[in-house]
A protein has these predicted regions:
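Residue-level recognition of specific faces of alpha-helices
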Residues: 15, 60-63, 82, 105, ...
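Polybasic "coupling" helices that flank or enter modular domains
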Residues: 127-174
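Cyclic nucleotide-binding regulatory domains
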Residues: 49-111
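Conserved active-site beta-strand element of glycosyltransferases/polysaccharide synthases
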Residues: 115
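A generic structural signal for short hydrophobic patches within well-formed alpha-helices
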Residues: 91, 122-123
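Hydrophobic alpha-helical segments typical of transmembrane helices
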Residues: 31-35, 121, 136
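Cyclic nucleotide-binding regulatory module and flanking cytosolic helices
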Residues: 1-47, 91-92, 97-99, 128
Length: 174
């Protein structure tokens, strides 16, 4: 990891304004209390600062609290290819789950803050709270669908159409 956790959250997930995006609906109060223990640290990033780099071992997934991050690949010829933008309430770092290390770089586009969700602790808790595991599956499914739409747009749309589709997607997420 290229960051050092900067603070311990004073507010809990259950009272965070972004909880509607991160927390599953229908949790019992005891489940909410357990989920509140997942986020023990946050990291504050300045514009251009990396959250993680391609090849870093998977340790956490991250929830964007404020700001915007991009994920990108470095191509063999040294060019950078942006593969995603991550807005408040969205999760990033999922690309590290399959191989055990991140497949992209995550970089702050502006001053940003993310909640650090240790993946191992999340997995343990998800086994205890099935609705949390279901929520995670939905998040991963949305990511796959978004990636498929992106691939479709690259293969079938003109540049103007791709730009319009990107702006529409971005406005729907805001």
């Amino acid at each position: 990891m290229n960051y050092k956790p900067t603070d311990t959250p004073t507010s809990k997930c259950s009272v965070c304004v972004l909880g509607q995006f991160c927390l599953p609906v229908g949790l019992s109060s005891s489940d909410v209390t357990k989920i509140d223990t997942l986020v023990k640290e946050r990291v504050h990033l300045q514009k251009g600062e990396s959250l993680y780099r391609h090849g870093d071992p998977l340790s956490s997934v991250y929830s964007v609290r404020f700001g915007t991050l991009k994920t990108e690949y470095c191509l063999q010829d040294g060019r950078q290819q942006v593969i995603g933008f991550h807005l408040p309430g969205e999760i990033l770092g999922l690309d590290g789950i399959g191989e055990g290390h991140y497949q992209s770089d995550a970089i702050a586009l502006e001053e940003s803050e993310v909640c650090i969700i240790r993946y191992e602790a999340f997995e343990d808790l998800a086994r205890q709270i099935p609705v949390l595991q279901n929520q995670f599956h939905k998040i991963m499914s949305r990511e796959l669908t978004q990636d498929q739409r992106h691939l479709l747009s690259l293969g079938t749309m003109r540049a103007e159409e791709r730009l319009a589709a990107f702006l529409l997607s971005l406005s729907q997420r805001l």
